[in-house]
Amino acid sequence: MDPVVVLGLCLSCLLLLSLWKQSYGGGKLPPGPTPFPILGNILQIGIQDISKSFTKLSEVYGPVFTVYLGMKPTVVIHGYDAVKEALVDLGEEFSGRIVFPLTAKINKGYGIVFSNGKRWKETRRFSLMTLRDFGMGKRSIEDRVQEEARCLVEELRKTNGSPCNPTFILGAAPCNVICSVIFQNRFDYTDQDFLSLMGKLNENFKILNSPWVQMCNNFPILIDYLPGSHNKILRNNIYIRNYVLEKIKEHQETLDINNPRDFIDCFLIKMEQEKDNQQSEFTIENLMTTLSDVFGAGTETTSTTLRYGLLLLMKHPEVIAKVQEEIERVIGRHRSPCMQDRSRMPYTDATVHEIQRYINLIPNNVPRATTCNVKFRSYLIPKGTAVITSLTSMLYNDKEFPNPDRFDPGHFLDASGKFRKSDYFMPFSTGKRVCVGEVLARMELFLFLTAILQNFTPKPLVDPKDIDTTPLVSGLGRVPPLYQLSFIPA
């Protein structure tokens, strides 16, 4: 018999055995499309827009279904009711994080994003308490964001209305806020170390969103035996970790346990308090990875939202005009915006929310994992199963947001023009793994966008109707196309 035929039969048998085990050997997975050997359902899922493929599959198989990304099953949960049931009602059972081969090489199970169990719980609890103590959502961090907003405005003023690519400067502002929280101070936008750090973070985010990295995570053998952009991520990560380690050493030399200056100091003090605990999760390794996580998550997500937001606003100049009218009426031109202004600026608040809804930055959430065998609806999902919760299915729900494919701040306004909250608005996810930096990110988006539109009118280089807002090919997140604009003084 032809060796190729034998190999094909063997692989098919292995796949059938795997499917049988999941159906009868400890779990009853939801239905889904029949997978191919080795590849699973990858060929049936459009890489260009995975969330759209999941929506189509939900119409066939219902709100809970199974796909195979490679040879391992992934349960997809689609729609508000099912997502809420999983992430909120059964929050503990769905609070695990799936371990991707590439991130495992980078983080080694440490940090806050891709850790699990006791380490994740303790690191997350510490991070939330520390950020809260330093004023997340309170006055002190608002001061830092306002300071950075003023620096951002001055940097934009230096362009003198000439066309520019906003990618770097819109990344520098949120990155500097993170620096002020974990390193105590911000950097000048021309600082070479800062420029290098920004470059590595931006490059990593782009690579992580590439189809190649998705292939590497589904077929780990590619990581060790083939060249590719995944190696660039590993090299960039070494640079970022070394940079962070130098900052930690500087803090160790000047630490005053009675007067913590920033996040690093607080972590070092916690390490000292637990130095006799052999099982302590507060180690230098965990600190380095946690800081790298905070940098990556806290910089690129906010930066991309700002960049995408300005592109959408330029395509809808009537929205810019309404926001600027509200800014003029509530704030004026002689003081900086503050968070107290938000409650008196419903249209601006609605616009910020609509930007986040429309861009749908992380359409399929960061994949979770079950922490135990879970009975979910009529299925039994085995411990350790990958779970994808579709945020698209809520942010683009046509009953909650009529004409969801249209950018319209009215989605968040009631009939009287007051701001309208929506339970379907979950760009930061929900439940036990909700984004740690949600409060900070909301503050940055409101203050940065308001400060920009208070001082400038973004002007495209093409007719607004010709602006293309279609995202580039994306994996984890949706990235806007590159563009240039002019910041015309208002």
UniProtKB/Swiss-Prot annotation:
* Compartments reported by the entry: Endoplasmic reticulum membrane; Microsome membrane
Task: Name the InterPro entries for this protein.
Answer: Cyt_P450, Cyt_P450_CS, Cyt_P450_E_grp-I, Cyt_P450_sf, Cytochrome_P450_fam2
| Principal EC category | oxidoreductase
- Cofactor(s) recorded in Swiss-Prot or TrEMBL: heme
Topological relation to the membrane, as annotated:
Peripheral membrane protein
- What Gene Ontology terms describe what this protein does at the molecular function level? heme binding; iron ion binding; oxidoreductase activity, acting on paired donors, with incorporation or reduction of molecular oxygen, reduced flavin or flavoprotein as one donor, and incorporation of one atom of oxygen
Q: Please, one GO biological process term?
A: organic acid metabolic process
Q: Which reaction does it catalyse?
A: an organic molecule + reduced [NADPH--hemoprotein reductase] + O2 = an alcohol + oxidized [NADPH--hemoprotein reductase] + H2O + H(+)
Q: What is its main location?
A: endoplasmic reticulum
E.C. numbers: 1.14.14.1
Gene3D superfamilies xref list: Cytochrome P450
Q: Which residues does heme bind?
A: C435
Keywords, A to Z? Endoplasmic reticulum, Heme, Iron, Membrane, Metal-binding, Microsome, Monooxygenase, Oxidoreductase
Keyword Membrane in annotation: yes
Q: Which GO terms describe its cellular component?
A: endoplasmic reticulum membrane
Which CDD domains does the record match to this protein? CYP2C-like
State what induces this protein. By phenobarbital.
Query: What is this protein's function?
Result: Cytochromes P450 are a group of heme-thiolate monooxygenases. In liver microsomes, this enzyme is involved in an NADPH-dependent electron transport pathway. It oxidizes a variety of structurally unrelated compounds, including steroids, fatty acids, and xenobiotics.
Which protein family is named in the record? Answer: Belongs to the cytochrome P450 family.
Protein name, entry field: Cytochrome P450 2C1
What species was this sequence derived from? Answer: Oryctolagus cuniculus
The organism's lineage is: Eukaryota, Metazoa, Chordata, Craniata, Vertebrata
